[in-house]
Structures are given as structure tokens and as C-alpha cells.
């Protein structure tokens, strides 16, 4: 046990976590030179293309230290995006230590702080690493100072390294061996193992990534899952180094995989404790808090006969992504589909992209919304995540919207722009601190404003330097209304929005004029209206295309022409009564692009 070290790598987006993981794997001989490629642990195509990590991945390595002993290192690479912060906390709870990677040219950023606090809360030893010191713009002294000022941990012994060139990677491993404590645990006690992650493999069923806390786990053991009380027979165990290798057993303190022929991911819940049937553990390990979706959107197949295949795709995707939630819903405009819950906008984009790529789905997505709490006249509280389901105004006492606490780090030069943006988004400033070149802003903001396009705007008004981290705070009463779009006086439920009353007029006008550009011309006039309740706030018309029925009358009597025009008029009137307007996919996306 003394020779085991479990550690994760935590950092802000693009500070070089995955590159550092590559270097460490290479140095420990986990892969030969031929198999080495950039971002070894990022296994999905999307992760590679976007250059981000989505799923935490592990590697078990052996390292011969300078003191001549051989240590077993279990490395877990974690994501940096705020949407995937729960992956970070899961990885950290399986470790005794963490490498806090900070880009020496950028300094401390929002996720650095958030992830580091998560680590400190879980009582994990944090080893600061200053990466990218080969860059001409690197300023290690300043970065050191920022770590001490902002986070408050001692950075005097921070390791200087460059993951790109491989400089200082050995020093990092020496620091891991020297400063991170070995795992505590008793190999002779009854088995207790924590499920850190689980995913579906087409050949063997569900693969569980576990951290063994006490006892040993070996094939042919009868396993008991403590939360679901399911029983399974263990088929094989092993480790990822980073390729999977079978082992005879996993002992206390080790991180590895367990396969037990489960076909349902529900049985292997992340955060559950595994024990054996013959020697049961008395109490389960503290798991993780269930992650709640923050953003909801409707996903509909373009062809209505694709509904079943979309359902199967979502089921398969959920096997790999425990935080995705979905339930069937029906829309008058779009037919049958699903209401899906996501952790944030990036998560939503990635799920959509994976459905389109890996499962060949053609999708229509509705605008993302957050969950509102509605207090009814009779005192009951309901949660509404779909604008079309908002009850009638006469039955509601008040609507409460979710408020978040946003922590923003921004260089001083862009401070004004960021404050202006936060005020436009109905933000309330709570705190502001200067740390060297950086300013730390704390704002309370409505989640609905952050969901739409806040992140993109924050990046563009600070030339990409500002960084954001947010946490849910509470529900607060808000003056919000439901904005409906009517096309030929028919409500289109998929275009409904819940907006703040102050923005409603403007959003209504913008949306109506956007729709006018996107809806193709018909043989009759199409009226597009934006309404709050029964009050119409804006109207646009799509002019009819007109066939020239008088083309064949050269000269001749006026009554002849009148007869033809009347006939055309009657035809158009009849057409307008029965005709329905096709709404193109772009129109649904237009809702997303209306600026506040």
C-alpha cells in the first residue's frame, strides 16, 4: 500500500492537463513511442476535435523513483469545463492528491479556483504545477503569487514544467511520490469499493471504474450493490494502463475496472458502494450528490417515423453519460420528441453532436430554458421546464427563477466591458477583488440570462481572457411573462419563451421580424404575431406570392378582369383557411439568436 499513489490532474480549460497526462504516461512507459499520440486519454472524436476533455479517464502506471523504489501511480485526467465539474469531484473523491496545473502565462482562472476548492473540501493534498514555462510570455513568479493570493495555498515549492517539451515532468512525478500520501485502507477488511464511473461496452456490457477502499475484489466474487441492492457475479477485474489489462485481483487503495455482465447502467450507479455477499460491509461509502440538470431543451426527430430510433439512441447515450436526463413529450408543431435535461449549454451541444454523429440522427432542437418554480394560488409549488406548460396567469401567485452566483476572472483592461455585460444581463454585483493583473468579480445573476449566450459574449468582450464559474444559489420571485408566437393566429408551442417583462417587447419584435425573414412565402398572406397572453405586442406579414391571372386578357371588358380577380380572391381565401405553414428548422434556432 505504501507504494500506491492516486492522483488527478485539475486545471482550467486549456492549461495543459491532457498534454501533461500524455507526458506522464510516456515517461512511465505506459505506451510505446509508436502508440503515443496527442491526447491519449481523450478517446471520443469530439474531444479530439474540440481539444477538450469530457469524460474523466484513468491510467495505472509504474514509476521508478530516484530513491530506487518502484511506485504504482494511478492517474485520473479530468475535464476543465464548468459544465463537467461533477466529473472533477467524482475523480477527486477517488484520490489522495491532485496536481493543480496553472498556465504560467495566464495565471489563475475561474475553474482553477473552483476545482481547487473542490479538492480542498474533499481533503485532498494539492500540488501546484506551473505549466508552459517554455513560452516567452510565461511569468512563473507572478503566477506563484496569484496562487497564494487567490487560492491561499503555499506555492513556494510549485513545480516548474512544460508538458509540451517534457521539461520538469520527472520533478512532477517526484513531487507526487514525496508529497501525496499513500491510500489508507485495510486489505483484510470486508470489501468496500466506490464506483467512480460506468459506461457501456458493446462486447462485455457495463464496465465500472472503481476505487477499492477496503478489502480485495477478484473474479467469481458475488457482488452486492448497496444503493440498488442488486446482486452480480464478478467476471473480470483489471486496470487501464492506459490500455485495459486483466488482473487476478484489485486490492485496497487501487483504481481499476470491474466487469460483471450487467446490461443496464441503472444497476451500476455512479457513487454506489460495492461489497461482497459473503462478507458484507456494514455501511456504504459517502457517495456523490446527484447532479441536477440546469438547462432543458426539446429534441425532436425531423422525420416523425424516426421517434423510436431517437429513443434508442438516447438510451445508449445515457449509458455513457449519467447526467443526461430525458422524458417523452408531444408538441403540436413538431410531433413526438423528448424533453432533455443538460448540465449546461456545452453539454447540450455535445449531446446533440454525438446524437448526430454516432447515431446518425436528424434533429430539431428547441430553445434551451431553465426550470422555473411557480407558486399557485392554492399554495402548491410546481416546477416548469417547458414554456408551453406555464399555467394560466390567473392561477399563478408568483414565478420564481433560478439565481446563480457567478465568479468571473478578468484582466483589468477588460473590466469595464465585463461589468457592462453583467448589468445588461440583470446581474447584481456582490464582490470585487484585485489580484495583481487579474480582477475577481462575484455577481448574482438569473440563470436564464447565462444559459442563452452569456459565455460567448463574455469571451468576445474580453478578447477571450475572461473566465467564468457558476453555482446555483436559490430561487427568487421574478417578473417574467410567457411570450407566444402566433402564425396565422395559431400558437406554435415550440417557439414559446419565458422572458423578463422588461425585455418582452423587444424580444417579441425581434423574433417576429426574424421569423418574417425565415418563413417562406406562401400563396396567401402569413401573419406572424408575438403575444403576451391575449395582448399582441408585435406583428409582421409575409406577403403572398401572386399569380398574374390577367395575363391572358388583352384589352377587353373590365368586368371580365373583375371576374377573374374575384375568382382568385375567393381561391386565396379558401386556401388560407385550410393551408398550414411549414416552419423551417432555422426558425426554431432563431429563438436562440435573438440578442437581448
Swiss-Prot record:
CDD domains recorded: EF4_III, LepA, lepA_C
Sequence positions that bind GTP: 14-19, 131-134
PROSITE patterns given in the database record: G_TR_1, G_TR_2
Membrane topology: Peripheral membrane protein
Keyword Coiled coil: no
Alphabetical UniProt keywords: Cell inner membrane, Cell membrane, GTP-binding, Hydrolase, Membrane, Nucleotide-binding, Protein biosynthesis
Location, primary (coarse class): membrane
Biological process according to GO: positive regulation of translation
Cell location: Cell inner membrane
Pfam families: EFG_C (PF00679), GTP_EFTU (PF00009), GTP_EFTU_D2 (PF03144), LepA_C (PF06421)
GO molecular function list: GTP binding; GTPase activity; guanosine tetraphosphate binding; ribosome binding; translation elongation factor activity
Catalytic activity: GTP + H2O = GDP + phosphate + H(+)
Enzyme class: hydrolase
EC number: 3.6.5.n1
Annotated HAMAP family: LepA
Stated name of the protein: Elongation factor 4
